[in-house]
Swiss-Prot record:
GO terms for biological process: mitochondrial tRNA wobble uridine modification; tRNA methylation. PROSITE patterns: GIDA_1 (PS01280), GIDA_2 (PS01281). Keywords: FAD, Flavoprotein. This is Protein MTO1 homolog, mitochondrial. Belongs to the MnmG family. It comes from Caenorhabditis elegans. InterPro entries: FAD/NAD-bd_sf (IPR036188), GIDA_C_N (IPR049312), MnmG (IPR004416), MnmG-rel (IPR002218), MnmG-rel_CS (IPR020595), MnmG_C (IPR026904), MnmG_C_subdom (IPR047001), MnmG_C_subdom_sf (IPR044920). FAD binds at residues 23-28. Signal peptide: none annotated.
Amino acid sequence: MLSKSTRLLRRCFQTDVDVIVIGGGHAGCESAAAAARCGSNTVLVTQNKNTIGEMSCNPSFGGIGKGHLIREVDALDGLCARICDKSAITYQALNRAQGPAVLGLRAQIDRKLYKTQMQNEINSTKRLEILEGEVAELLVENGKIVGIRMMNETVIRTKCVVITTGTFLRAQIYQGMKTWPAGRIGEKSSDRLSESFLKHGFELGRLRTGTPPRLMKDSINFSKFERVAPDRTPIPFSFLTKNVWISYEDQLPTYLGHTNDEVCRIGNENMHENYQVASETTSPRYCPSLESKLLRFPKLHHRLFLEHEGLDSPHIYPQGMSLTFKPEVQTQLLRAIPGLENVEIFQPGYGVQYDFVNPKQLKRTLETRKVEGMFLAGQINGTTGYEEAAAQGVVAGINASARAQNEPGMEVSRTEGYIGVLIDDLTSLGTNEPYRMLTSRAEFRLYLRPDNADIRLTELGRRHNAISDNRWAIFTETKGELNNLTQRTEEMKMSMVKWKRIIPKLAATSRNDGKVLSAFDLIHRYDLDKSDLELCLKDKNIGEDILERLKIEGRYQMEHERMKAKKQEIDRESATAIPDNTDFSTMRGMSLECIEKLERARPRNLAAATRISGITPEAIVVLMRHLKNPAPVRSSAV
């Protein structure tokens, strides 16, 4: 009897495969689902179908900047937000006091439940097949991808390929001074694909990351840690989720603790037996290992959070304690922390080094510049984190489908979304360290908020066939209600004296008695609630969520007006391309330092050039003058 994989291979020869996605991680799942959703016959190739949707490191989604990405993936009808809302066990939003613009949606996730829900979603997606196996070679003819060759020599022809191999390219795991080839504990690395990239002239780099040990829950004395309660009013990730599936009482707390002098002593005494310390490969700046923390701040105490890995899981994840020491040293370190004196380790922490492709070799659609029809997404592009991977995955999947169907690709500008900021930073400036999304990277973060991600991106996704009819119906209804309420509240105007007669809570307000204000002004200035608005409009059918969105829009309205001119300027700069063969050394009036930085960064457009550290306004003026009246460019002849 034929195996499912063999039967699928035979079907692949008889029917067209529009898109092949290599890798079943967060980028791969989003990419495969998006391509299929857009109407392309899609095959997801993975070494093991049982690891699809695996949360390789932390049991959480979201955070500052990252929560914005999840909302934007959801606005493009991606999967991860909805799956998180079906598997979250603790909601703890960050930055609530700093305002809606930088609110960090975050939740602890049940690993097992998330993976099960994701696999169910992938398996039920129309036009999407799963194939188990390892890809040995990318088949390219005349600069265009035409298929893949599997390790068993089977060839599958296709129009487009999306590569989402995560940390598996020529990957090596290490603990202490011991190293061995693997992309994840117990899973082999993908070496042949790296060779295929090099064969086709791609520039590869090397990065590293790590993961903490997993601890046995029943060996921990939680009473010595500070209990951190979940949010009483959790905020869902998806616009389609009205209420989260788990009650406040059933959510699990996290626990806060700190390292101490003894941890510092043990760590510093064992640094000489740590491969990571000896290695020159760059590690994540914003998710450092304990070794990196001790090297930079040898005398400081560092925070750690104990996080549950699932509702019924016996394991605890120590957030902030990524370790690559040998296992016995990890045990010694952990047992020096109060509450962990008797801790047992289920799985020691480890580090992993892997190849990545310089993302400056990509277009803004995430298609490679060297090979037509080849798209890259996720950690292969130098990023770190589930959310960054998912964001790239949904864009790559939409654009691979568009390419396969000879339709225009979708680009998100940095003025439209954090996805645009992410992709623009990668493709324009590249990266020499694992890239993490931060709100500080976005120039228009007061506009690029989690609450309005659907308003910003869902119509764009619909134009590229990425939005289901169900989501579109919900979105158009929401947008219509918001526009209607905005218009009604803007048109209803009267003096503050009259408003005080209608809304009792305004009676104590002494200012602006003679000033004419609209109901829209009052909502965000005086934080009116649903009952207040009902008094204004004599309407009891106003939804709490629509009112909250209206308040936020009002809060940032003046800033939006001020930003319009700047947004237009950045859009113009982004559209001003800098040719690949531009010779910056011929530009008169530019300092040698700026020339060297421009030569090294090779920005793709004027907007990217302005973001290079050390590039002066004078240098930008010279560059703009050159782009209008270009001097002779550097010869590309060999």
